[in-house]
Amino acid sequence: MRTGRIERNTAETRILIEVNLDGRGNYDVSTGIGFLDHMVEQFSKHSLIDVTMKVDGDLHVDQHHTTEDSAIALGQALGEALGDKAGIGRYGQAYSPMDETLSRVALDISGRPYTVFRAGFSQEKLGEWDTELIEHWFQSVAQAAGITLHIELLYGTNNHHICESIYKGFARAMRQAVELDGRKGGAIPSTKGQLGG
């Protein structure tokens, strides 16, 4: 079973993350930020990656540390669960419609973190979550997990739909990328014989 577990404790946040790449999309998420919880739950449900995320952060300051640190820990847990990445699909891509909104997500579990985020929001908050932190969340996950990640909003007007479309697209692309392909016989999916660098 491909699992990862990260405990990350700082003066700003205390975090426990557990993931199971071969799960069923079960989740237990509590960050203290309701809309972020909702998005991580969407990620788990649509990627079929089981996610436990428990965060006690300094929300009396603002939401930045909780958002960033939970994303870093999630990326680290995903990286731990992937191990040497033998046999994985490596690449994933998804178009994700939600009513009037359509987004596109493409990713490569390459070991070379890079994020392109081309989406904007017309309001400052979704629930109580600052929308400027959405891009930062994806950057932090990709950096910690070693993922090349491209996110593009093709069109859409409703901010909730835009965010949820992106998270669901990320989930579906991750499902493709982490899936084991029996034809590869456990080989590393790179002509270099390794991923990263």
UniProtKB/Swiss-Prot annotation:
Pathway: Amino-acid biosynthesis; L-histidine biosynthesis; L-histidine from 5-phospho-alpha-D-ribose 1-diphosphate: step 6/9. SUPFAM superfamilies: Ribosomal protein S5 domain 2-like. GO terms for cellular component: cytoplasm. GO terms for biological process: L-histidine biosynthetic process. It is an enzyme of class 4 (lyase). Keywords: Amino-acid biosynthesis, Cytoplasm, Histidine biosynthesis, Lyase. Coiled coil: none annotated. Belongs to the imidazoleglycerol-phosphate dehydratase family. It holds the Pfam family IGPD. InterPro entries: IGPD_sf, ImidazoleglycerolP_deHydtase, ImidazoleglycerP_deHydtase_CS, Ribosomal_Su5_D2-typ_SF. It is found in: Cytoplasm. The keyword Amino-acid biosynthesis applies. Its EC number is 4.2.1.19. One of its GO terms (molecular function) is imidazoleglycerol-phosphate dehydratase activity. This is Imidazoleglycerol-phosphate dehydratase. It catalyses: D-erythro-1-(imidazol-4-yl)glycerol 3-phosphate = 3-(imidazol-4-yl)-2-oxopropyl phosphate + H2O.
